[in-house]
């Protein structure tokens, strides 16, 4: 279960920031994420967070995916086709791999990611809404 929660955090990071040279624009984004895990005795609650992305965050998918450095996750097969971004990723230490797709409009995005964590599969659906410029705290 701990791996699934950590994986969920990684998925959120990917949805929020792993889009180098993508149509996503910098600023404050509200990200909603719903994980579906077959065989779980309960439904995972949706996650809703705000993420602030800079121009620098959007340049390198490898640097923009926050994860445990010990996991040594890599983003592979990263492609931008018009307003759609696709990718695959792998975290060998955690035996995690997956792929996903996100399609952007000017101020929204929708997408999905499928992950294999050991023997467990999960699908995450995303929606994102641009909320404006980031504010300093």
Features from the language model and the residues they span:
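Sec/Tat signal peptide C-region and signal peptidase I cleavage site
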Residues: 16-20
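Positively charged n-region of N-terminal signal peptides that target proteins for export
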Residues: 1-4
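Subset-of-secretome marker
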Residues: 21-137
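Short amphipathic alpha-helical "recognition" segments used for binding
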Residues: 6-7, 52
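Bacterial N-terminal signal peptides
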Residues: 7-15
């Amino acid at each position: 279960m701990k791996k699934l929660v950590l994986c969920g955090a990684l998925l959120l990071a990917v949805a929020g920031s792993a889009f180098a040279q993508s149509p996503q624009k910098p600023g404050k984004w509200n990200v909603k994420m719903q994980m579906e895990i077959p065989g779980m005795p309960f439904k995972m609650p949706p996650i809703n967070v705000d993420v602030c992305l800079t121009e620098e965050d959007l340049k390198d998918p490898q640097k923009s995916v926050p994860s445990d450095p010990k996991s040594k996750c890599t983003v592979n097969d990263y492609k931008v086709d018009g307003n759609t971004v696709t990718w695959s990723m792998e975290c060998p230490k955690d035996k995690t791999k997956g792929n996903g797709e996100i399609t952007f409009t000017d101020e929204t995005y929708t997408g999905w990611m499928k992950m294999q964590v050991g023997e467990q599969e999960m699908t995450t659906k995303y929606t994102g809404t641009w909320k404006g410029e980031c504010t300093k705290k």
